Amino acid sequence: MKKIKHTFYDINTEKAQNTERKAESELVLFCLSDLHGNEYGKQNRVIVETAWDQKPDLILAAGDMLSGEKEESDAVAVALLSRLADLAPVCFTDGNHEMQVKKFFPERYEAFMEGLKKGGVQVLHNETWCTEDGGQKVAV
């Protein structure tokens, strides 16, 4: 099994407002990228458990969740992001692998997008999505 890289950032901003739910306006983001359809444990158990442990307010899937070369990677990515959507809102944006699939296999790409949407994932295409968490407004 490939290793997962964990990186933690603490970002402070005066733009954040105190909220009812969290001390000091804490907002926890969980970001995934470049999984290329790989699984980390059965049904991506390692990623799902890591996300649950972090208790994120928002999950960002920053592209390259699938592999242009492996069609079976589509189902892996849809299953993972749909499962994570049960934990917190998930926003997805294309990476270069998704763009290649869109260009060369448009039907496959559309099926992938539909799978994400059915799984409760917010798919972003050059747009902004806004949500509110415990009084804290967030624009992605």
Give the residues covered by each predicted segment:
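Phenylalanine-focused residue identity feature
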Residues: F8, F30, W52, F92, ...
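N-terminal active-site segment of His-dependent metallophosphoesterases
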Residues: M1-R83
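Generic marker of "main functional regions" within proteins
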Residues: R21, K42-R45, L58-A61, A75, ...
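Active-site neighborhood of phospho(di)ester-bond hydrolases with catalytic His/Asp-centered motifs
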Residues: F30-S33, L58-D64, P89-N96, Q122-E127
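Alpha-helix C-terminal capping/helix-to-coil transition sites in glycosyltransferase folds
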Residues: D53-K55, L87, K118
